């Protein structure tokens, strides 16, 4: 998909359950996730089941004519030893999913010491957040249950691993807390973060591992230090529950999505509100009096940091370019709940209320040299450090995303 083209549906996966279970309570796909290296896809398909699917998809899932676009050269090397699809029975409704990065060498040694039954080559894990407050940790290659983390008193709504490979996990719950877990120490709970007054819907760790964002039902967005586990600041601006959040790949931007129909783009270092993306009605057949038609469900950054994808209750997947205030593309979808980009770009996965997963084409563009330089600099410079540089004002505005 080139920039400006409409997303095309590549494939749709439907749960293999009896039809009488469709549209029943607990059939929703609340979360979908790709592993950081793009080799696995996880799908909470409802009724306590998570599917682990090797990526790219096998041929039977891909419509004719799309093979070349959705399959990679990795597929040509698949043989008898290739990974197989796994079915995880979690025993409870699954709300949150998160893959760990491949653990760093020190974490691998600790993991091997505490889990000698798990070979070092099988260190990719999946965390599942459950309806009863439990978190289950699964070994991806084998589908074995490794750990069961207890502590939350209500639904675990979202999960996020530190991108560094340290196997630190953050969980967000309806019990109004976030909890920090160290999987290197048998899943020991190392911190409880309190302060939200209502359900915590989502959490996200910045790619540089310095900040944690959490958002809740009281319109609030909290930013925490991942070093001291203390509150840095609160971000005010939404008029309803904030249900989704994501950092840009260089950690320089934060986006939050709310039931108030807006996505807000923030500078997480200063707390400044940079821009709002309003989800206006585009279907004239829809009733203006329905205040919930554009309530947002999910927002995520593209891997190169130039685009956003959003899912809303008005039956649309939208794709936005950061420099524009209106979407560059739409795709019709029904009952969307979540979305995520493939880590290497080109594909967006969406989950729906009826338990389905859809894969869409996403923009593929060659990033400009200017953007690549900005992304590289902002990966290790805070906004305050950029503003302190002896460079022209226009360059500072570009590097801090005030201009594009």
Swiss-Prot record:
SMART domains cross-referenced by the UniProt entry: SOCS, SOCS_box, WD40
Pathway as given in its UniProt record: Protein modification; protein ubiquitination
GO cellular component, one term: cytosol
Alphabetically ordered keywords of this record: Repeat, Ubl conjugation pathway, WD repeat
Domain of life of the source: Eukaryota
WD repeat spans: 16-55, 81-140, 144-183, 188-226, 230-268, 283-322, 325-362
Gene Ontology process terms (BP): intracellular signal transduction; protein polyubiquitination
SUPFAM superfamilies referenced in this protein's UniProt entry, alphabetically: SOCS box-like, WD40 repeat-like
All residue ranges annotated as the SOCS box domain in the record: 356-404
Disordered as annotated region, ranges: 68-87
Comment text on domains: The SOCS box domain mediates the interaction with the Elongin BC complex, an adapter module in different E3 ubiquitin ligase complexes.
Protein name per its UniProtKB record: WD repeat and SOCS box-containing protein 2
Organism annotation: Homo sapiens (Human)
Gene: WSB2
């Amino acid at each position: 998909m080139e920039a400006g083209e409409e997303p095309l549906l590549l494939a749709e996966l439907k749960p293999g359950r009896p039809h009488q279970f469709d549209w029943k309570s607990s059939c929703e796909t609340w979360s979908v996730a790709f592993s950081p290296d793009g080799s696995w896809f996880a799908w909470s398909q409802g009724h306590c089941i998570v599917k682990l699917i090797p990526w790219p998809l096998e041929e039977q899932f891909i419509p004719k004519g799309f093979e070349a676009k959705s399959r990679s050269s990795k597929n040509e090397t698949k043989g008898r030893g290739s990974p197989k699809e796994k079915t995880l029975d979690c025993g409870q409704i699954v709300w949150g999913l998160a893959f760990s990065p491949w653990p760093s060498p020190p974490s691998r040694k600790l993991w091997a010491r505490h889990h000698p039954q798990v070979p070092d080559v099988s260190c990719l894990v999946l965390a599942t957040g459950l309806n009863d407050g439990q978190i289950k940790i699964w070994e991806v290659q084998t589908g074995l249950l490794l750990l069961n983390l207890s502590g939350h008193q209500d639904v675990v709504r979202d999960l996020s691993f530190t991108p560094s490979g340290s196997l630190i996990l953050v969980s967000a719950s309806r019990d109004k807390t976030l909890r920090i877990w160290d999987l290197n120490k048998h899943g020991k709970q190392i911190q409880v973060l309190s302060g939200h007054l209502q359900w915590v819907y989502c959490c996200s760790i910045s790619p540089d591992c310095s900040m944690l964002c959490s958002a809740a039902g009281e319109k609030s967005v909290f930013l925490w230090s991942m070093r001291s586990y203390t509150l840095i600041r609160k971000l005010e601006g939404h008029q309803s529950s904030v249900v989704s959040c994501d950092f840009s790949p260089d950690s320089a931007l934060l986006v939050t999505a709310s039931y108030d129909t807006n996505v807000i783009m923030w500078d997480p270092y200063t707390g400044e509100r940079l821009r709002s993306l309003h989800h206006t009605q585009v279907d004239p057949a829809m009733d203006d009096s329905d205040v919930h038609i554009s309530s947002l469900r999910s927002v995520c950054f593209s891997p190169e940091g130039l685009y956003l994808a959003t899912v809303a209750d008005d039956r649309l997947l939208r794709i936005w370019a950061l420099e524009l205030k209106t979407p560059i593309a739409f795709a019709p979808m029904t009952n969307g709940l979540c979305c995520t980009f493939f880590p290497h770009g080109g594909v967006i996965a969406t989950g729906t209320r009826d338990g389905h997963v859809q894969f869409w084409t996403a923009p593929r563009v060659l990033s400009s040299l200017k953007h690549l330089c900005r992304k590289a600099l902002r990966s290790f410079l805070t906004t305050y450090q950029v503003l302190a540089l002896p460079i022209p004002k226009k360059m500072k505005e570009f590097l801090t995303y005030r201009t594009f």
